[in-house]
Design a protein with these regions (language model features):
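Bacterial N-terminal signal peptides that target proteins for export
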Residues: 1-9
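Bacterial N-terminal signal peptides
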Residues: 8-18
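Flexible, solvent-exposed loop/hinge segments and secondary-structure transition points
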Residues: 19-128, 133-138, 142-155
Length: 155
């Protein structure tokens, strides 16, 4: 066997087996805002990563953009809170891992609706674990809990 083959074959095998990370943007910030607050006619920036959703002069709630680490890479997500600090909606905007994307499923994200800063929010408790996306589901749950702790009393 030539030196060239002996040196490149192991690298080629590793490259063919390793799964690449896939960065997929599912929603823009603007699209997620409109999904969360369809009656809003403006979003006023609040602190650089959150916006007050308004219909005229009426405050509808707060839209918060955040990110957490999945297993190795960032997950960008958004949480919409009503004026009482309750979760109205959670959306995954961008998922970069090559597996574990089940955290995007609407049935899983719907578990957060109605939660407040006093909710337990525990994977394996009031939030289902996703087999194959254990760390992603854990970290998104922790992120939503952090958003509620920081913004849940924005009134």
């Amino acid at each position: 066997m030539t030196d060239w083959v002996r040196l490149t074959l192991p690298a080629a095998l590793v490259a063919s087996i390793a799964s690449p990370a896939l960065a997929v943007q599912y929603l823009s910030v603007e699209a997620a805002q409109k999904l969360a607050f369809p009656s809003a006619n403006r979003f006023v920036e609040y602190d650089g990563k959150s916006w007050k959703a308004q219909a005229g002069d009426k405050l509808l709630g707060l839209f918060v953009l955040d990110h957490v680490i999945g297993k190795h890479l960032y997950i960008d997500y958004a949480v919409a809170l009503d004026t009482n600090g309750r979760v109205m909606r959670v959306e995954i905007l961008q998922y970069r891992e090559s597996y574990g994307g089940e955290v995007r499923e609407s049935s899983w994200l719907a578990q957060f609706v109605g939660k407040t800063s006093s909710s337990v929010l525990k994977v394996g408790g009031d939030i289902r674990t996703i087999s194959g996306a254990t760390l992603s589901s854990l970290h998104v749950t922790e992120g939503v809990k952090r958003v509620l702790a920081n913004y849940g009393s924005h009134r």
